[in-house]
């Protein structure tokens, strides 16, 4: 059950669908120009390329299981039904009332990990391997916290622009045009 937990969390931080996790091979882990490790795959569902930079937490999970597969796969992923059964037990053990699904990890990556932290939707779309940004927009339900943070940032930016400060508007003594009021 702990392996299924780790795999689910790996997907929460990479956005991989179950089948793409199952098929993930060492050859899909690449080092790019930024010297970071990236997952580069063609999604089974769409054939679209997905490029996902590995954050520290999924790297740690990957290292925990590396070398356990002899067929080049990164993880020894059990079959889908076995994973779903374990996921249901994990949810109950954690007091989660809504039944967990593997797709929830992908959704969590898109919303909680990326969009809520300011990652542009175009970038999220690329990482998820979507063909059309409209597909990604399904995930883009904004949280109240994100909305509040964004409006506060906007307010600070506007307040930093001297022309728009309330004081300059009210203290302007140029209320005359050609000497007339």
Language-model features, listed with the residues they occupy:
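Basic, Lys/Arg- and aromatic-enriched nucleic-acid-binding interface segment
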Residues: 1-18, 68
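Short basic/aromatic active-site micro-motif
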Residues: 2-5, 77-80, 97-117, 130
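C-terminal catalytic core of tyrosine-transesterase DNA break-rejoin enzymes
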Residues: 9, 13, 19-20, 89, ...
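Conserved tyrosine-mediated DNA breakage-rejoining catalytic core shared by Y-recombinases
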Residues: 14, 23-61
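Short, polar N-cap/turn motifs at the start of nucleic acid-interacting alpha helices
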Residues: 28-34, 97-98, 118-138, 149, ...
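Catalytic-site neighborhood detector that most strongly recognizes the C-terminal catalytic loop/helix
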Residues: 43-47, 80, 128-153
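C-terminal catalytic core of Y-nucleophile DNA break-rejoin enzymes
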Residues: 44-63, 69-89, 101
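C-terminal secondary-structure termini that scaffold catalytic or DNA-interacting sites
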Residues: 154-181
């Amino acid at each position: 059950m702990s392996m299924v937990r780790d795999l689910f969390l790996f997907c929460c931080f990479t956005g991989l669908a179950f089948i793409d996790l199952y098929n993930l091979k060492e050859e899909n882990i690449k080092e790019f120009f930024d010297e970071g490790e990236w997952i580069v795959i063609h999604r089974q569902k769409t054939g679209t390329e997905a490029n996902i930079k590995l954050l520290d937490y999924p790297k740690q999970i990957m290292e925990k299981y590396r070398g356990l597969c002899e067929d080049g796969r990164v993880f020894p992923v059990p079959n889908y039904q076995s994973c779903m059964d374990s996921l249901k037990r994990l949810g109950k053990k954690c007091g989660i009332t809504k039944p967990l699904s593997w797709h929830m990890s992908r959704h969590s990556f898109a919303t909680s990990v990326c969009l809520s932290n300011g990652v542009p939707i175009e970038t999220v779309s690329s990482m998820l391997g979507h063909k059309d940004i409209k597909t990604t927009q399904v995930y883009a339900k904004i949280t109240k916290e994100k909305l509040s943070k964004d409006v506060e940032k906007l307010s600070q930016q506007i307040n930093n622009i001297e022309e728009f400060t309330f004081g300059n508007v009210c203290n302007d003594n140029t209320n005359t045009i050609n000497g007339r009021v």
